Amino acid sequence: MKAFSPVRSVRKSSLTEHSLGIARSKAPVDEPMSLLYNMNDCYSKLKELVPSIPPNKKVSKMEILQHVIDYILDLQLTLDSHPTLVSLHHHHLSRVGGNTSRTPLTALNTDISILSLQAVELSSEFTDESKSLCP
C-alpha cells in the first residue's frame, strides 16, 4: 500500500471565514496541516495584494514579508504626507521623536547580497594569487 498525501481544494473564502469568526471543529490530527494550509493561503493572498511583488516571480515567505513591511511603511509615508494630516503628523513626531526617511528592506537585502558576492569574488582572487606564489 502506497502512502499518499491528501489533496487540498483551493478555497477563496478562507480569509472571509476567519474574518467572520466561523470555526469548524477539527480532529487534533488535522489541525497542524490545516494551520499550514491557512498560512500558505495567507502568504498567497499577501503576494497578490502587494504591488511591488512581480506576479509571476517565485518569492520566499521572507521576501513576501519584506515587501509587505515596505508597502505598509510606504503607505504610512504617503498618508503622513497628505496635506491635511501633515500638521497632525508633525505634532505626533515632536512628541515621539520619529523620523520618516527610511531605506526599504528589499534594498538593504540587495546591498547585502552584492557585498556577499563581492566578498566571494575577492576571496577567489586571493586564492588565485596565493596559488601563483606557491611553487
From Swiss-Prot:
Motif (Nuclear export signal): 108-117
GO CC terms in record: cytoplasm; nucleus; protein-containing complex
PROSITE patterns named among the record's database cross-references: BHLH
Annotated S-S bridges: none
Molecular function GO labels: bHLH transcription factor binding; protein dimerization activity; transcription corepressor activity
Subcellular location: Cytoplasm; Nucleus
Pfam families: HLH
Start and end residues of each bHLH domain: 23-75
Database matches in Gene3D superfamilies: Helix-loop-helix DNA-binding domain
Quaternary structure, from the entry: Heterodimer with other HLH proteins.
Designated name of the protein: DNA-binding protein inhibitor ID-2-B
